[in-house]
């Protein structure tokens, strides 16, 4: 029987790096881990609230967190930083205030920086967010997937695989649809595979979107 494993965890330390960089004592480890998750959720919620309009999106690729004794460094890798707000400086300051209030700790410094992703549609998280917005706007899933593959191929990737599950186009019976472009060697450890899952909340229910992108080999 086949055994499934997360493609990112399977390659952790080979082609994938950790998103959190810190060390903690055993009794504080779970608290810091939960705090990292709350920081990421706070950033994602802030981005959604401050989008200029519904058709545009921030496109967060990943959030890296580094901790020191009295300092938390957060680096947001984002595809389209100009779509967030008009004044980026003021926006970062407001985001820092929101995160600090959520942490409820005045003894630690908080630094937040934004890094632009060079080829955003080559990142599965950004591409999945694009697909979800199209499906929520009732665009045909076949048309959406075809356009998504075209956008990904423009980012010089070697292969992409997309899975969408649920009541596609409002059909009564849920099903799973696949689409692939290029080569996606999931069993090759040295292959740089990026993967993500993203839910699309439509009027017919929730659709599950999974994307695998093959960038290159080590």
UniProtKB/Swiss-Prot annotation:
Cellular compartments per GO CC = chloroplast; cytosolic small ribosomal subunit
Q: Which UniProt keywords apply?
A: Chloroplast, Plastid, Ribonucleoprotein, Ribosomal protein, RNA-binding, rRNA-binding
The yes or no answer to whether the keyword Plastid is present is yes
- The species is Ginkgo biloba (Ginkgo)
Q: Which residues form a coiled coil?
A: none
- Classification via CDD domains: KH-II_30S_S3
UniProt record similarity statement:
Belongs to the universal ribosomal protein uS3 family.
Q: Where found?
A: Plastid, Chloroplast
Q: Name one GO biological process term.
A: translation
Pfam families from the xrefs?
Ribosomal_S3_C
Domain named KH type-2 is located at 47-118
Q: Name one GO molecular function term.
A: rRNA binding
Has keyword Chloroplast?
yes
Mind telling me which InterPro entries this protein's record contains? KH_dom-like_a/b, KH_dom_type_2, KH_sf_prok-type, Ribosomal_S3_C_sf, Ribosomal_uS3_bac-typ, Ribosomal_uS3_C, Ribosomal_uS3_CS
* Self-association and partners: Part of the 30S ribosomal subunit.
Q: Which named protein is this?
A: Small ribosomal subunit protein uS3c
Chief subcellular site? plastid
Q: Which NCBIfam families match?
A: rpsC_bact (TIGR01009)
């Amino acid at each position: 029987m086949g055994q499934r494993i997360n493609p990112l965890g399977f390659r952790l330390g080979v082609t994938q790096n950790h998103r959190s960089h810190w060390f903690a004592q055993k009794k504080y480890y779970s608290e810091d881990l939960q705090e990292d998750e709350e920081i990421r959720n706070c950033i994602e919620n802030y981005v959604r609230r401050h989008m200029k309009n519904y058709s545009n999106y921030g496109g967060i690729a990943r959030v890296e967190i580094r901790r020191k004794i009295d300092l938390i460094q957060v680096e947001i890798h984002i595809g389209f930083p100009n779509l967030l707000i008009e004044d980026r400086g003021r926006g970062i300051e407001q985001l820092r205030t929101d995160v600090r209030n959520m942490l409820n700790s005045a003894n630690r410094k908080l630094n937040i920086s934004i890094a632009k992703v060079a080829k955003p549609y080559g990142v599965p998280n950004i591409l999945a967010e694009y697909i979800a917005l199209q499906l929520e706007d009732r665009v045909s899933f076949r048309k959406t997937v075809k356009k998504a593959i075209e956008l990904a191929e423009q980012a010089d990737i070697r292969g992409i695989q997309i899975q969408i599950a649920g009541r596609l186009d409002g059909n009564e019976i849920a099903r799973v649809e696949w689409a692939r472009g290029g080569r996606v060697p999931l069993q090759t450890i040295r292959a740089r595979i990026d993967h993500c899952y993203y839910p699309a909340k439509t009027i017919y229910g929730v659709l599950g979107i999974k994307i695998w992108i093959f960038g290159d080999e080590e």
